[in-house]
């Protein structure tokens, strides 16, 4: 009986040490930034997406009441 308890204890400690030794997830500390670019004419996806990709290496979406704002989201 004592051998069985020690075996379970050893296995539990081994599993716990393996779980604690696992590295943190990659990219867990990446932050997202958002920038609004005001355009002089109504926003189109053909204009907004390349603009955000060139300036910020991110994604773009047309927002605003009359789609006059291009909102860019990118990794800070």
Swiss-Prot record:
Key word Repressor present: no
Give the signal peptide as a residue range, or say none if absent: 1-27
Q: What is the annotated localization of this protein? A: Secreted
Main location per UniProt?
secreted
The terms describing its cellular component in GO are: extracellular region
Keyword entries, A-Z: Antimicrobial, Disulfide bond, Fungicide, Plant defense, Secreted, Signal
Bilayer-spanning residue ranges: none
Q: What disulfide bonds does the UniProt entry report for this chain?
A: 33-76, 43-62, 48-70, 52-72
The record ties this protein, via Pfam families, to: SLR1-BP (PF07333)
What does the record list as GO biological process? defense response to fungus; killing of cells of another organism
Q: Could you name the domain of life of the organism this protein comes from?
A: Eukaryota
Q: Which family does it belong to?
A: Belongs to the DEFL family.
Please give the name of this protein.
Defensin-like protein 163
**The organism of origin for this protein:** Arabidopsis thaliana (Mouse-ear cress)
Gene, per the UniProt record: LCR24
């Amino acid at each position: 009986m004592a051998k069985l308890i020690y075996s379970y204890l050893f296995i539990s400690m081994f599993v716990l040490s393996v779980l604690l030794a696992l590295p943190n997830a990659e990219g867990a500390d990446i932050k997202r930034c958002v920038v609004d670019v005001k355009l002089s004419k109504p926003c189109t996806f053909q204009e907004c997406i390349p603009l955000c990709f060139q300036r910020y290496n991110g994604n773009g979406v047309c927002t605003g009441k009359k789609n006059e704002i291009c909102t860019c989201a990118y990794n800070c």
